[in-house]
Each structure stands twice: as C-alpha cells, then as structure tokens.
C-alpha cells in the first residue's frame, strides 16, 4: 500500500521551465486583515527615469508574505515622507500604524546606487515629537532620537538592488518581531516540461521566484532535492542511469558525488542539521528502510527494520532523532525514532493518513500532509499537546518544506489541473501560489539561511 503510494509520489515529483527573470510569479490568494499594519513608504529616487528595482515594493511584498504584517497601500497613506523630519506621527498612529520604513536612493560619484533607509517607531516618535533626549557618558543631555530603530546606508550595483531590498526586509522583520527574517533564502524545485529536449530540470530561485537558475537537466526523472545546511549543495535522486541513485551536487561548481546506488529503490535524501550525515531510504533488503550515511567516513547504519515500509526521514533540530512515514499500522502515519536507543513512537493520530512530515526549527511542531474527508492538505501538529490545525484548502497538497525561520511553508499543489508551488504562513492565515509560466513544478525545498 505505502509502496504503491511512494511510487506514485515519485513518478509525479517533477516539474519546471526556462531561464527568465521570474519563471515563478507569486500570486497572493488569501491575505490577513488582522496582521500588523506597517507603512513602507515609496523610496525617493533622486535621478532620471525609473529605478531598476522598486525597493519599497519588494520590502512590502516580503513583509506581507510573512503573514505578520499588512503594509498600507500607497494610495491610502496619509503622506509619503522620505525623511524622518517630515513625518506626521499622529496621522500614522490614527491608522493603527506603529512603524514605518522610509528611504531614498541616489547615484554616487562612483556610479553606484546609494540607498539610505530608516525604520521608525511611530508611537515613540509621537510621544517625543522626534526629539527624545538622554544623558551621555559625560552626563550631558543629548538628542538620542531613539524613535529611529534602524538607520543604514549602502552603496550598490544594479545587480545588488533586489538582494539588498530583501536584506532590508530581514532587518525590519527581525527588529519588529525578534525573529530572524528569511527573505534572502532560496528554493530548489524540480520541473518537468514534456516538450523540452531535457524534460526534467532541477532549478533554484530566490524564495519569491526571482533569479531562477538551472542546476541540472536530464532526460530521466529527477526528484527529492534537499539542501545541505551551508546552502552550497543539494542532495537529490536521479534516474539518469535507468535506475534510482542518490547524488550530492555542489550548486556552484557542478561537482557531483554518488552516495547510493543499491538494487531497487534509493531515495528521500535528507541532510542532518550539522551536515555530517545523510538520511536515505533503501529497499535493498526488501521493504523500504531508513539508513544514515556518515558523509566523512561513508559508513552506513540501518535505522529502521521489519516488514513495514519506512520512508521520508527528517531530522529533529538536535540531530538525535528522526521523524518518518511508516505503514506499520496499516496506513501511512508519522513516527519518531530515537537514534541512540532505536525506540520508536507514533506521533500522528488525527486523519486517515499523515505523511511527508517536517519539524519546525524550534522543534515545537510537525508540518505534514494530512488526509481527511476533504482530501490531502497541509496540517500542523503541536508536538506537546497533539493539537492539529489544517493550514490549506488547496488540492492534492504534497512535499511541504519549512522556511529556516519557521514562518512559512512552501509545498506542491494542483491549480487548474497543473502542478504549482504554493505558500502558506505557519499559522495558516496568509496563502499564495507561484504558478510557473512553462512546466509542472514539484518537490520544493527551502534553503537554510544564506
């Protein structure tokens, strides 16, 4: 039963398109009215024509996708100041906005873009009129202007503008939430285009679909990409030699290393969080079983045994246990195995099937594919209480992958009879999809912090 399900999952675990500025166009499908309002004021451009990148629009989109912020539309802003001295604090606080981002861009003498931005605490600014004071080390009363939370300047090339906009988003997100932002991360995914010379393509892009790059192309299936913790390598399954094999590839040099090429099935690679080991699934002894390969010594240890099929391993944050999918109870459910003593515990009970589990970076939740009367949808389970929350309402969801800060999940779903990538915030309130312009997109993997 599980073996048939795994084969079906592998056969469709493919998809993608051609090189372009953004092959994946992110479309918001469900926003958040109750998210925290924030003002991302259009950056003032001191130059001719248009900026190559709309920095404020990128920041606004990033923060909205996090599910925690609701940027005020430009046409609804009470004003569009680019200097903190021009801010009408009362006008912003009346809208419920407690923070705004302002900035300006100009060309410097070296021909680069000089970007200046500030993150401003509107409430603090209203209380102090922007003129807060405090005693310095010598006991002298000085102007602190502590309503300005961030004040930075950078000199950038045209190619660096978009990346720096994501950097600003990371800074703003962390300053206001206390959590690290994940807007400078990437996603890897597989695309299949039946009409292409090489139908199967492994690609990477910025988390929002921009700056897409081809990593590998093949006439045979590619599936199950997984990032190394340093973001430099991808493990994946290839059928290029007419059988399943597991490789690790350096995405910058293209150098590959063959990890597993045993009889029958080789699949589901997953790096440990320290990068020293790789969990894989083999069927060389009959049923699907989980093994761990030491990447330095190449020594391999078998983790699961028995007649049941065990697959989809994922490491706990402390690397001391794995969660995995098993049909030992009749239908696929998620279990945890202690790597020290081999003890195993079933974790999921709600829903006829639960599979594809991943643990959030803080170790508090499992995100998984949950089958219920409504179909296959993503769900989140609290590991302490066992409470389950269904996160999505899309069709035939699979392959969830969690952002390194735990704030968002990317996954594969069906939209208009086509495989697309979709996103959902970890609380289920914000949803978006990234339909490709050409090809079927599957098997997403969110990178670590880069």
Swiss-Prot record:
Task: Name a biological process GO annotation.
Answer: protein import
Looking up InterPro entries in the UniProt record yields: 6-blade_b-propeller_TolB-like, PD40, Tol-Pal_TolB, TolB_N
A Pfam family found in this protein is PD40
Q: Which residues form the signal peptide?
A: 1-22
The question of whether Cell division is a record keyword is answered with yes
Source organism's superkingdom?
Bacteria
UniProt keywords (A-Z) are: Cell cycle, Cell division, Periplasm, Signal
Matching Gene3D superfamilies: TolB, C-terminal domain (2.120.10.30), TolB, N-terminal domain (3.40.50.10070)
For this protein, the record's SUPFAM superfamilies field holds: TolB, N-terminal domain, Tricorn protease N-terminal domain
Q: Coiled-coil ranges per the record?
A: none
Tell me where it resides: Periplasm
Q: Which GO terms describe its cellular component?
A: periplasmic space
As for family, the record states: Belongs to the TolB family.
HAMAP family given in the database record: TolB (MF_00671)
**Any idea what job this protein has?**
Part of the Tol-Pal system, which plays a role in outer membrane invagination during cell division and is important for maintaining outer membrane integrity.
Which NCBIfam families does this UniProt record tie to the protein? propeller_TolB
Q: State how it assembles.
A: The Tol-Pal system is composed of five core proteins: the inner membrane proteins TolA, TolQ and TolR, the periplasmic protein TolB and the outer membrane protein Pal. They form a network linking the inner and outer membranes and the peptidoglycan layer.
Protein name in UniProt: Tol-Pal system protein TolB
Source organism: Aliivibrio fischeri (strain ATCC 700601 / ES114)
């Amino acid at each position: 039963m599980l073996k048939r399900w795994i084969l079906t999952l592998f056969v469709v675990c493919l998809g993608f398109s051609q090189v372009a500025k953004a092959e994946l166009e992110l479309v918001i499908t469900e926003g958040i009215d109750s998210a925290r309002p924030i003002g991302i004021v259009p950056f003032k451009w001191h130059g001719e024509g248009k900026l190559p990148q709309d920095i404020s629009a990128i920041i606004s989109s990033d923060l909205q996708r996090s599910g925690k912020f609701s940027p005020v539309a430009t046409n609804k802003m009470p004003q569009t100041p680019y200097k903190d001295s021009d801010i009408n604090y009362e006008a912003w606080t009346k809208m419920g906005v407690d923070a705004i981002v302002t900035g300006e861009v100009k060309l410097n003498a070296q021909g680069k873009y000089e970007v200046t931005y500030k993150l401003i605490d509107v409430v603090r600014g209203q209380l102090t009129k922007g003129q807060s004071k405090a005693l310095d080390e010598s006991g002298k009363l000085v102007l602190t202007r502590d309503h300005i939370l961030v004040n930075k300047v950078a000199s950038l090339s045209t190619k660096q503008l978009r990346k720096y906009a994501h950097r600003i988003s990371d800074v703003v997100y962390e300053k206001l939430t206390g959590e690290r932002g994940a807007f400078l991360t990437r996603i890897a995914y597989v695309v299949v285009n039946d009409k292409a010379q090489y139908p199967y393509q492994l690609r990477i892009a910025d988390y929002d679909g921009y700056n897409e790059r081809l990593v590998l192309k093949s006439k045979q299936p590619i599936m199950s990409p997984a990032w190394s913790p340093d973001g430099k390598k991808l493990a994946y399954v290839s059928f290029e030699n007419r059988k399943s094999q597991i490789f690790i590839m350096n995405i910058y040099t293209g150098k590959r290393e063959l990890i597993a090429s045993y009889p029958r099935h080789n699949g589901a690679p997953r790096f440990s969080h320290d990068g020293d080991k790789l969990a894989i699934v083999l069927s060389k002894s009959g049923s699907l079983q989980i093994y761990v390969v030491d990447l330095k010594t190449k020594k391999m240890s078998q983790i699961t045994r028995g007649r049941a099929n065990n697959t989809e391993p994922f490491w706990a944050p402390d690397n001391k246990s794995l969660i995995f999918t098993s049909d030992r109870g009749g239908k696929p459910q998620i279990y945890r195995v202690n790597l020290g003593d081999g003890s195993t515990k079933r974790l999921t009970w709600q829903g006829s099937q639960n599979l594809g589990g991943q643990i959030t970076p803080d170790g508090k939740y499992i995100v998984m594919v949950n089958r219920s009367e409504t179909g296959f949808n993503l769900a989140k389970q609290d590991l302490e209480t066992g409470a389950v929350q269904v996160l999505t309402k899309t069709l035939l969801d699979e392959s969830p992958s969690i952002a390194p800060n735990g704030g968002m999940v990317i996954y594969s779903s069906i939209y208009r009879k086509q495989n697309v990538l979709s996103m959902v915030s970890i609380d289920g309130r914000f949803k978006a999809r990234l339909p490709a312009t050409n090809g079927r997109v599957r098997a997403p993997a969110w990178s670590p912090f880069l």
